[in-house]
Amino acid sequence: MALFRNLGPFHTTAIGHGEMPLTIENNRGHDVGIETLHASLDAGCRHIDTAWAYYTPGEEEQTGEKLVREALDSWKGPREEVTVATKVGLRRAWEGDKPVWPRDGKPEHLIEYGKQSAMALGVDSIDLLYLHRHDPEVPYNESCEGIKALLDQGVAQWAGVSNVSIEQ
């Protein structure tokens, strides 16, 4: 039996499934990704974490969010019990032969990415949306205003931040 906790207004499992390794470089393929998410859900997991930037650089963007949508659409369990969190504010690129994670905290881009995330996930409103990482080129409060705009527009129900320091 899974242990449940409150995450803001959501009553969800204390342990969630981080989707990143299923869609970034060196992943084991689409079908294995679907099977893996189904196995987690079947085992009682009710929280999935993904991000706009979970894809292999140079390939289709947002494959992580799209994989989560497909897994939830094809899963035979109670979809309404599953909380999905996603993040915006990072992109993917290559520097030589090394994958990198450029930051993009411009409010207008965060708003665009948030709307794209809702579409990729197939939802009217994202359960929980995070600012993925602070962009040092953009004042922190400006990035937060972009996230707040997504809340105000109903694109996301709740918001948070990820990978930040106490000072930020």
Question: Which residue stretches match the model-derived regions?
Answer:
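Active-site-proximal loop/turn and secondary-structure-junction residues that shape catalytic pockets
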Residues: P21, W52-Y54, V88-R92, H132-D135, ...
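Gly/Ser/Thr-rich helix-start
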Residues: H17-E19, E65, L90, V155, ...
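Short beta-strand segments at enzyme active-site cores
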Residues: H47-A51, T83-T86, S125-Y130, G160-V161
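N-terminal binding-site loop/beta-alpha segment at the start of enzyme catalytic domains
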Residues: M1-T83
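Glycine/proline-rich, positively charged
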Residues: E95-Q168
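Glycine/Thr-rich phosphate-binding loops of Rossmann-like dinucleotide-binding domains
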Residues: E25, T56-G58, W94, P136-P139
